[in-house]
Amino acid sequence: AILHLLGCTDCHHENLIASRDQLLLIDTETLLEADLPDHIREADASNETVGPSKLQQRFQRSVLRSGLLPQWMFMGQAKRAIDISALGITPPASENQQQPGWLGINSDGMMPGRVSHRADVPTSLPVGIGAANPFPQYLDSFCSGFATQSEALIAQRERWLQPSSALNRFAGLQRRIVLRATRVYFALQRQQLEPAALRSPQAQALKLEQLARSFLLAETKPLHWPVFGSERRQMQQLDIPFFTHRIDGNALELDGKGTTLAGFIKTSGLQAARERLRSLNEEEIHFQMRLIRGTVQAKQLRVNSPLTKQDSSRSRSKQTDNVSTEQACQRIAEQLLNMAIRDPEGQVEWLGMDLGADGECF
């Protein structure tokens, strides 16, 4: 709950270590993450682009943003599903795993292939090789702890919002902001070092031109267009682009010379944390817990998952209930109404599960 309040966004398995009954955060660089506007949509001169709904915005700013909870990522052309979250990652099945490497090293027959490496055990889980991820077994305890922490934050709300509070000490401090996944920069960096890319400045420029493609979706020049120039200059030096901003500011620093891009940030990380604290109430706690339970349940589902005995017995018991069609429809309608989420403007939406890019995971 505290990580969610402070806007942490990078709680993958390498950034947390399980120690006894505690989960320790060892990389705090993404605390107090700022909220960014959709610069591409804002550059639409016709203003015909439909923005996210209230529920979608709420979902994007939810506890799921922390990266702590199970969530799928789909990698490569095969859309292979992987989970690198601290509480969702799966321990390796065996001590050794096959990975890309070199065969016949230091010989005339040296060639790329698959080699055996010792498997890395996730530090964020209290179990080792061959064990199942135990998090689903403790979901109720986790949700209970989340609710308890949230209630404690509500009790301390006024103290945290005071000008002399610990939260306010972050004002004026600099922090890094990651505008693209660093793996994108690393992939481009490898392309820059390929023989074909080293033959001319034009070949190098064509590799870096790929960074501009996301900006070209805008009808007019977007406000954050200077970001591309900064990315290009830094990658020409074979550096991974690095950007910073003040935790309580709305300007992005483009380089080490003090060049800034005003208005890049919609809501500063510090202001966003204050807003989350002010809006924290029983209904908000319940909403976040629904997301926590939903993401854990979705992680365990598969398109071709067989029905368990428990599921089959439930299905049979429902079929034998002596209810009329009208009563059954009424029950379904009541469930839909109970699960509905209403915003202040009266719009009604529902949370659901979506099929992943691999066509198998949810």
Predicted region positions:
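Regulatory N- and C-terminal appendages and interdomain linkers associated
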Residues: 54, 68-362
